[in-house]
Design a protein with these regions (language model features):
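Extracellular/virion structural assembly segments
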Residues: 1-159
């Protein structure tokens, strides 16, 4: 399992990527692979177990252990991430580009580890980029030879 305190800017310490805040320890984000980045983050499918009673009331019967995130990260640039030999099931640590927020004044607390230096307060809300320990679920890349672009997508779920 990767070390969560490690700065996962790139697997090769000689070529850190100064072009993005995205870090993927275990895969790496080389220079020229991170333009056009997008990240979605949401609950895993098993997190939602809602059922209706015989009277029609909606009840949440989900197990708190399933309160985990899934994420999809995609980009289009001139180079791909280091996907070679990185198969589904590999544990990785993602310093997200997507942000989460909570409201301490309402008794809410931060639910995930924050990427160091990413926390900020906006009015009553605290916003941060989470650091997630995940397993690769799937990835793909496509090459546009004539356009000299490589598109890629990484799907991962929190362990």
């Amino acid at each position: 399992m990767p070390d969560p305190s490690y700065d996962a800017s790139h697997d090769d310490p000689l070529t850190p990527n100064a072009f993005t805040v995205l870090r993927i320890q275990g895969v790496g984000v080389p220079p020229y692979s991170a333009r056009g980045l997008r990240q979605s983050i949401g609950p895993i499918d098993q997190a939602s177990q809602n059922r209706r009673t015989v009277n029609g009331a909606l009840k949440d019967i989900s197990f708190s252990g399933f309160q985990k995130y899934k994420t999809t990260i995609s980009g289009t640039d001139q180079r791909p991430p280091n996907f070679d030999g990185k198969w589904p099931g590999l544990t990785i640590i993602i310093d997200c580009i997507a942000e989460l927020s909570y409201t301490p004044d309402e008794g809410e607390t931060q639910q995930r580890t924050a990427v160091p230096g990413s926390e900020r307060v906006e009015a009553a809300h605290t916003v941060y980029r989470p650091r997630l320990t995940c397993k690769i679920m799937n990835f793909n890349q496509d090459h546009d030879e004539y356009g000299a672009q490589i598109g890629w997508t990484l799907d991962a779920e929190e362990v």
